Amino acid sequence: MIWLRRVINLYNLVRTGWLLRGIPPSQAETVAQHTFLVAFTSLMISRDVISKGLSVDLGKVLSMALVHDIPEAVEGDIVKWVKDRVRGDVNKLDLEALSELGLNDLKDLMLELNSEGSVEALIVKICDNLATYIQGRVYYELGFKEVNDILEGSLSSINEYVRKLPKGYNEIVKNIVNKVIRSLS
């Protein structure tokens, strides 16, 4: 089990974007904490979509949510600014990192997620940004106003991914996300 010791390190790997905006390391969210919130919001949104009669593979959603940042056990936390500029290279690195961790069987899942090739992948992408937004709001309310650009960027990304969802899904997910965001006010 090559992956076990490396993946456990995600409990201690602080998300760099928060540090760059003045969040003290002792208060900064870790990759594992972020992953939990991504998985939980993915679960809740998927259940709501399913309850409206639309199809979502809940197992795939949860698997993608749990795996989406596993490569960071090898790569470290790569900030969005860098990812946006070297997207294709980061996607290749993600696959190499999974190999190094002995998790080759998760490569297809990562490819689908990174290509945004399904409703499930888009839900996880939305929830990845929603989890970042939720944590950013916590920091903002604690007085860390420097996180505002992350809040704005997360909302912009959420809206972009919602627009990519098929008709029917997009309105349901948009309404759920808006309820979550309003509940933070």
Each model region followed by its residue ranges:
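Alpha-helical, largely C-terminal catalytic domains
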Residues: 1-185
